[in-house]
Regions:
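Hydrophobic alpha-helical transmembrane segments of multi-pass integral membrane proteins
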Residues: 1-134
Length: 134
Protein backbone atom coordinates (compact mmCIF):
# COMPACT_ATOMS: atom_id res chain seq x y z
CA UNK A 1 0.00 0.00 0.00
CA UNK A 2 1.43 3.43 -0.90
CA UNK A 3 2.35 5.68 2.02
CA UNK A 4 -0.32 8.28 1.14
CA UNK A 5 -3.02 5.59 1.07
CA UNK A 6 -1.91 4.39 4.49
CA UNK A 7 -2.18 7.95 5.86
CA UNK A 8 -5.66 8.35 4.36
CA UNK A 9 -6.86 5.03 5.77
CA UNK A 10 -5.37 5.67 9.22
CA UNK A 11 -6.93 9.12 9.40
CA UNK A 12 -10.24 7.66 8.21
CA UNK A 13 -10.14 5.09 11.01
CA UNK A 14 -9.51 7.82 13.60
CA UNK A 15 -12.53 9.73 12.30
CA UNK A 16 -14.57 6.52 12.34
CA UNK A 17 -13.77 5.97 16.02
CA UNK A 18 -14.54 9.60 16.89
CA UNK A 19 -17.77 9.63 14.89
CA UNK A 20 -18.88 6.28 16.29
CA UNK A 21 -18.13 7.44 19.85
CA UNK A 22 -20.06 10.67 19.39
CA UNK A 23 -22.94 8.72 17.84
CA UNK A 24 -22.96 6.32 20.79
CA UNK A 25 -23.06 9.22 23.23
CA UNK A 26 -25.93 10.80 21.30
CA UNK A 27 -27.84 7.52 21.30
CA UNK A 28 -27.23 6.97 25.00
CA UNK A 29 -28.37 10.53 25.66
CA UNK A 30 -31.71 9.71 24.05
CA UNK A 31 -32.31 6.88 26.50
CA UNK A 32 -30.75 8.35 29.63
CA UNK A 33 -30.25 12.12 29.39
CA UNK A 34 -26.59 12.74 30.18
CA UNK A 35 -26.29 16.48 29.64
CA UNK A 36 -28.29 19.01 27.61
CA UNK A 37 -25.20 20.00 25.63
CA UNK A 38 -24.64 16.45 24.39
CA UNK A 39 -26.67 17.30 21.29
CA UNK A 40 -23.97 19.76 20.26
CA UNK A 41 -21.98 16.67 19.23
CA UNK A 42 -24.40 15.93 16.37
CA UNK A 43 -22.77 18.18 13.73
CA UNK A 44 -19.33 16.81 14.63
CA UNK A 45 -20.70 13.25 14.48
CA UNK A 46 -22.03 13.89 10.97
CA UNK A 47 -18.89 15.70 9.78
CA UNK A 48 -16.52 13.06 11.15
CA UNK A 49 -18.41 10.17 9.57
CA UNK A 50 -19.37 11.69 6.21
CA UNK A 51 -16.21 13.59 5.33
CA UNK A 52 -13.63 12.41 7.82
CA UNK A 53 -14.27 8.70 7.50
CA UNK A 54 -16.11 8.03 4.24
CA UNK A 55 -14.44 10.51 1.89
CA UNK A 56 -10.99 9.98 3.34
CA UNK A 57 -11.30 6.19 3.08
CA UNK A 58 -12.50 6.55 -0.51
CA UNK A 59 -9.51 8.78 -1.34
CA UNK A 60 -7.09 6.33 0.25
CA UNK A 61 -8.47 3.33 -1.59
CA UNK A 62 -8.76 5.23 -4.89
CA UNK A 63 -5.15 6.38 -4.66
CA UNK A 64 -4.09 2.80 -3.97
CA UNK A 65 -6.11 1.31 -6.83
CA UNK A 66 -5.15 3.88 -9.44
CA UNK A 67 -3.19 3.58 -11.70
CA UNK A 68 -3.87 0.30 -13.35
CA UNK A 69 -1.32 -1.78 -15.25
CA UNK A 70 1.85 -0.44 -13.61
CA UNK A 71 1.63 3.05 -15.05
CA UNK A 72 3.15 6.00 -13.21
CA UNK A 73 1.14 7.99 -10.68
CA UNK A 74 2.10 11.35 -12.17
CA UNK A 75 2.45 14.54 -10.12
CA UNK A 76 1.94 13.57 -6.47
CA UNK A 77 1.65 17.10 -5.05
CA UNK A 78 -2.12 17.47 -5.57
CA UNK A 79 -2.73 14.08 -3.96
CA UNK A 80 -0.53 14.90 -0.97
CA UNK A 81 -2.22 18.31 -0.72
CA UNK A 82 -5.58 16.60 -0.40
CA UNK A 83 -4.76 15.13 3.02
CA UNK A 84 -4.09 18.41 4.90
CA UNK A 85 -6.81 20.30 3.01
CA UNK A 86 -9.49 17.76 3.86
CA UNK A 87 -8.47 17.38 7.50
CA UNK A 88 -8.14 21.13 8.04
CA UNK A 89 -11.57 21.60 6.50
CA UNK A 90 -13.19 18.94 8.68
CA UNK A 91 -11.68 20.34 11.88
CA UNK A 92 -12.47 23.93 10.95
CA UNK A 93 -16.14 23.07 10.35
CA UNK A 94 -16.34 21.09 13.61
CA UNK A 95 -14.60 23.75 15.71
CA UNK A 96 -16.65 26.55 14.13
CA UNK A 97 -19.81 24.76 15.22
CA UNK A 98 -18.59 23.96 18.72
CA UNK A 99 -17.04 27.31 19.52
CA UNK A 100 -19.69 29.48 17.81
CA UNK A 101 -17.15 31.04 15.48
CA UNK A 102 -18.42 33.39 12.75
CA UNK A 103 -20.20 31.82 9.79
CA UNK A 104 -17.31 32.64 7.46
CA UNK A 105 -15.10 30.16 9.34
CA UNK A 106 -17.52 27.33 8.57
CA UNK A 107 -17.66 28.47 4.94
CA UNK A 108 -13.85 28.50 4.89
CA UNK A 109 -13.85 24.91 6.17
CA UNK A 110 -16.20 23.88 3.38
CA UNK A 111 -13.98 25.68 0.85
CA UNK A 112 -10.98 23.70 2.14
CA UNK A 113 -12.95 20.45 1.81
CA UNK A 114 -14.00 21.37 -1.74
CA UNK A 115 -10.39 22.26 -2.56
CA UNK A 116 -9.33 18.83 -1.28
CA UNK A 117 -11.83 17.12 -3.58
CA UNK A 118 -10.68 19.27 -6.52
CA UNK A 119 -7.02 18.49 -5.79
CA UNK A 120 -7.70 14.77 -5.65
CA UNK A 121 -9.75 14.91 -8.85
CA UNK A 122 -6.93 16.88 -10.52
CA UNK A 123 -4.50 14.15 -9.58
CA UNK A 124 -6.72 11.16 -10.38
CA UNK A 125 -8.33 12.37 -13.63
CA UNK A 126 -5.43 11.55 -15.98
CA UNK A 127 -4.98 8.16 -14.33
CA UNK A 128 -8.50 6.94 -15.13
CA UNK A 129 -8.33 5.15 -18.46
CA UNK A 130 -10.84 3.02 -20.35
CA UNK A 131 -10.33 -0.73 -20.34
CA UNK A 132 -9.79 -0.84 -24.10
CA UNK A 133 -8.65 2.24 -25.95
CA UNK A 134 -10.02 2.72 -29.45
Amino acid sequence: MPRLSAWFVRAALVYFVLGFTFGGLLLANKGVPLHPLTWRLLPAHIEFLLLGWTVQLAFGVAFWILPRWNTKRGDMRPAWGTLPLLNAGVWLVVLAGWLNWPAWSMVMGRVLEAAAVAAFAWHAWPRVKPWVEA
